[in-house]
UniProtKB/Swiss-Prot annotation:
Family: Belongs to the VHL family.
Cellular component GO terms held in the UniProt record: Cul2-RING ubiquitin ligase complex; nucleus; VCB complex
Annotated knockout phenotype: Increased mortality induced by B.thuringiensis pore-forming toxins Cry21A and Cry21B. Increased mortality and sensitivity to paralysis induced by enteropathogenic E.coli infection. Increased mortality upon heat stress. RNAi-mediated knockdown causes an enhanced resistance to polyglutamine or amyloid-beta-mediated paralysis and an increase in adult life span.
GO biological process, one term: protein ubiquitination
Keywords: Ubl conjugation pathway
Assembly and oligomerization: Interacts with hif-1 (hydroxylated on 'Pro-621'); the interaction induces hif-1 degradation. May be a component of the cullin E3 ubiquitin ligase complex.
CDD domains: pVHL (cd05468)
Organism of derivation: Caenorhabditis elegans
Name of the protein in its database record: von Hippel-Lindau tumor suppressor homolog
Top-level taxon of origin: Eukaryota
Pathway: Protein modification; protein ubiquitination
Length: 174
């Protein structure tokens, strides 16, 4: 897309995975400040997203994780990227002192989108079989973008549907 609304390489999830170098447990609270539900994912060592939960607006999720375990959040409806502490990927950091137990707060917020992206994503609320007729009057480039959004929504739905409830991040081997 020419306007930069597709961030990074256009993938739903970054090409990142967890490592097992640090076994210090880190407590995190994800708080949804978006106007819509979001899904919270841990990126496992195989670089696969593992869904930990869906947060309604103003709800939170408490988890235990480890350093070098990346976390991301996506809008539940279509997989649109949102920010975690103003970043696309959250990397937990342990407390500064070993004996101090602290829960890190991670605020999930909306990303700024162009009007073009907002308009294109508005078609995602329609029945997918009706969208081709609804976008016929749009410029060809916009039609391709809407089709791309529909493909990403389908891909996201498949990822979420195959997610198995997690056993929890595994403690690194010593």
């Amino acid at each position: 897309m020419s306007d930069g609304s597709m961030d990074d390489d256009g993938r739903l999830f970054p090409d990142l995975g967890s490592s097992t170098h640090d076994n210090r447990e880190i407590r995190v609270r994800f708080l949804n400040r978006c106007a819509y539900p979001v899904d919270v994912f841990w990126l496992n060592p195989s670089k696969q997203p593992t869904k930990y939960g869906t947060l309604a607006q103003k709800k939170y999720l408490d988890i235990k994780t480890f350093k070098d375990h990346p976390w991301v959040a996506r809008r539940s409806f279509d997989g649109c990227k949102v920010l975690v502490n103003e970043k696309e990927v959250f990397w937990p950091e342990p407390a500064p002192r070993m004996n101090l137990i602290v829960r890190n707060h991670c605020v999930i917020t909306m990303k700024v989108q162009s009007l073009r992206e907002i308009a294109g994503r508005s078609f995602l609320r329609h029945n997918p079989t009706e969208v081709p007729n609804k976008i016929k009057g749009l410029p060809r480039e916009l039609q391709f973008e809407v089709k791309h959004f529909l493909d990403r929504k389908q891909e996201y739905s498949e990822i979420v549907c195959r997610s198995i409830p997690p056993p929890g991040p595994q403690r690194p081997q010593q």
